Regions:
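Donor nucleotide-sugar binding/catalytic pocket of nucleotide-sugar-dependent glycosyltransferases
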Residues: 168-224
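Short alpha-helical donor nucleotide-sugar binding micro-motif in glycosyltransferases
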Residues: 297-298, 305-310
Length: 420
């Protein structure tokens, strides 16, 4: 018996060397599908001279790794920098390239669109982007199933950047936009039950929970302490890993730090990542001298070492959708203190593998972290329970569920009799 292979066209608005959680997840997903024998056509953003040289030099797994598979092909669509975030791409308008022509040539069994709203132009308030739902024209004409993979809580982003007043003015049209976006696709899949519920209340059509967003639990592991980037530093370590942007609420880290340091003077806050707020955060961190380290980007075993070394992982963002770094920390045996948001309640069980803090409340974050660091018995208990709590989201398990959904939508059996 052998597995029936599929021809899968996968569009993504973000991919290596553009560093985001979406980019990393897409690469892992495509790699896994190729390992299963499926033919994958990856349509991804082009890296060109409009972006800084630093972007193109990131040591990320990408096309070179996938090109070793005979069943892989790709196309880099033309891009320009996102006007609000110059290190991330936006596709050029459909006048410049045709998703339909690409699909006509490949003739997929199913189309997957990752971060569909971003590709269409929502991240730039429609000032940029493709200008129409990606892949939908071909899907409708050929009756090919097409799914949208939901990554970003866009409504939370809108509220965060516009503020409550402007968001209140815009709120009446949000359900109309959500309904229009979701109606274009055969299925819209969410990795968080709470996020699905939120968007269903906003008129999302054909939404379904599929736990596609896993992590490699064999890769992220407590044993990675052997890769500790600062092995001679014995201070208790609070770790943040992510983009240094406003929506990640990174400034909350520096609001909470002095409150923690007042109780634990030798505490060390390490911020790993880069982004538009990098210089502002560095300027603010100067007053804490050696208590706060802005490490910059981290990759490979060094990053694994940070997750395993940390005593507590902190995530103040309220815009996450089943946050990957939360899971990576837990798999590494590190308790998490995260902002209370729809998806974090599915990752963090209060008092079991970490704590949830009130959003935008530095005092509450500080109290939760102090409680862990001042109580070795509690810290040991949370650490011991962190990894088992997240094993159900191992990458292989989640990828299998994603593949099952593809077979269901295509309507062919997974297993066929071998010719022998």
């Amino acid at each position: 018996m052998t597995k029936q292979t599929l021809r899968i066209a996968l569009f993504t608005g973000l991919y290596s060397p553009f560093l985001t959680g979406v980019s990393v997840a897409v690469h892992q997903r495509v790699h896994w599908l190729l390992e299963q024998g499926h033919e994958v056509f990856l349509i991804h953003p082009q890296i060109n001279n409009k972006f800084s040289k630093q972007v193109g030099k990131r040591p990320m797994a990408g096309l070179e790794e996938l090109q070793s598979f005979a069943n892989f092909s790709s196309y880099a669509f033309p891009t320009e920098p996102l006007i609000f975030y110059k290190s991330l791409p936006q596709p050029l308008h459909y006048r410049h390239w045709s998703d339909t022509k690409l699909l006509e040539k490949f003739q997929p069994d199913i189309i997957v669109v990752e971060e569909a709203a971003q590709m269409r132009g929502l991240y730039s308030a429609f000032l940029q982007g493709y200008g129409r739902p990606v892949g939908v024209d071909y899907a409708k004409r050929t009756k090919t199933p097409i799914i949208s993979v939901f990554h970003t809580d866009i409504v939370a982003y809108i509220r965060y950047y516009l503020g409550d007043f402007l968001f209140g003015l815009m709120r009446p049209i949000i359900p109309l936009l959500v309904k229009q976006f979701s109606n274009a696709y055969t299925l819209n899949i969410f990795s968080s039950r709470e996020q699905l519920s939120k968007y269903q209340k906003l008129e999302c059509l054909r939404g379904e929970y599929v736990p596609y967003q896993g992590i490699n639990c064999e890769k992220f592991h407590p044993r990675n302490i052997c890769y500790d980037p600062i092995p001679n530093d014995k201070r208790p370590t609070i770790l943040f890993v992510g983009r240094i942007t406003a929506e990640k609420n990174v400034t909350q880290l520096l609001d909470a730090y002095p409150l923690i340091a007042a109780q634990i003077p030798d505490v060390h806050l390490v911020i790993v990542g880069s982004g538009p707020l990098d210089q502002e955060i560095r300027r603010r961190a100067q007053k804490f001298l050696h208590g706060v380290t802005l490490w910059g980007e981290s990759h490979g075993t060094e990053l694994l070492g940070w997750f395993a070394r940390a005593d507590v992982f902190i995530n103040p963002s309220v815009t996450e959708n089943f946050c990957t770094t939360n899971n990576e920390a837990l798999a590494s045996g590190t308790p998490v203190v995260a902002a209370m948001a729809p998806s974090t309640t599915e990752q963090v069980t209060v008092g079991y593998n970490g704590f949830l803090a009130q959003p935008n409340n530095a005092q509450d974050f500080a109290e939760k972290i102090i409680a862990i660091l001042q109580n070795p018995e509690l810290k040991a208990q949370l650490s011991a329970q962190a990894r088992p709590s997240i094993l159900e989201f191992d990458w292989s398990v989640c990828s299998q569920k994603f593949e099952d959904k593809l077979y269901q939508l295509v309507g062919i059996p997974q297993i066929v009799k071998s010719s022998s």
